[in-house]
UniProtKB/Swiss-Prot annotation:
Compositional bias ranges of the Basic and acidic residues kind: 227-239
Role, per record: One of the primary rRNA binding proteins. Required for association of the 30S and 50S subunits to form the 70S ribosome, for tRNA binding and peptide bond formation. It has been suggested to have peptidyltransferase activity; this is somewhat controversial. Makes several contacts with the 16S rRNA in the 70S ribosome.
The protein's assembly and partners: Part of the 50S ribosomal subunit. Forms a bridge to the 30S subunit in the 70S ribosome.
GO CC field: large ribosomal subunit
InterPro entries named in the record: NA-bd_OB-fold, Rib_uL2_dom2, Ribosomal_uL2, Ribosomal_uL2_bac/org-type, Ribosomal_uL2_C, Ribosomal_uL2_CS, Ribosomal_uL2_dom3, Ribosomal_uL2_RNA-bd_dom
The protein's name in its UniProt record: Large ribosomal subunit protein uL2
Alphabetized PROSITE patterns for the sequence: RIBOSOMAL_L2
Pfam families, per the entry: Ribosomal_L2 (PF00181), Ribosomal_L2_C (PF03947)
UniProt-listed SMART domains: Ribosomal_L2 (SM01383), Ribosomal_L2_C (SM01382)
GO terms assigned for molecular function: rRNA binding; structural constituent of ribosome; transferase activity
Source organism: Roseiflexus castenholzii (strain DSM 13941 / HLO8)
Domain of life the protein comes from: Bacteria
Amino acid sequence: MPVRKYKPTSAGRRNMSVSTFEEITKKEPERSLLEPLRKKAGRNVYGRITVRHRGGGHKRHYRKIDFKRDKVGIPAKVAAIEYDPNRSARIALLHYVDGEKRYILAPLGLNVGDTVMSGPAADIRVGNALPLRQIPLGTQVHNIELEKGRGGVMVRSAGAAAQLMAKEGNYATLRMPSGEVRRVFIECMATIGQVGNLDHQNVRLGKAGRKRWLGRRPEVRGAAMNPRDHPHGGGEGRAPRGMPTPKTKWGKPARGVKTRHNPRTDAFIIRRRTR
């Protein structure tokens, strides 16, 4: 997916780039696989903001994606590669031989007309989903389950891929895109290949308005606030933080502080992430 750069005809266009969408083969989504998507604007069920800087943006429908890949042994043909406004990856529309239609994440190299399948008997081919037990060492995989039958939850964004490094007992060792090395139950499903749309990271929005189209509102610096609103706030003119380490809006240490608190699964992490 090449990236198109604009000529600097205005301040907003000067550093702007967009995807060319050359891989998209179908504009209108499959209506049977759409669901309404209500805007939350970062609020929880009590109406309180739990995620800041969210709101507005273009109206969307949710595309129902098959993360479980549980149609075992039934081949499907790739009917189209589509755009999904809810994720960075492209999605592929599958037509199964029994008549059912489903969306999956479109891996790199998957084209219209290709055949994909799920299950232990599937070939080691891009787009096929198999248990980690059946996948050879060194293979790149994505859409990886953490619990058998719950559906893939890891390695789903554009250009992401994990590598199967080892198998020992009931666990497989994977190197994640972040550099983390962790163990996963060997019967969990994973899809062969790397997620497509590699050039997503090279797209530059260029102006604040494109952020607003995506539903992202402005982020105000703490130093620009009053002292009652942020630990960095206050002072006459531009003032230093006045503390040894930066703090969050709620007084917690910020920037480089570990935020992971799940000791139950620490035993599955062999090496911490590098970035």
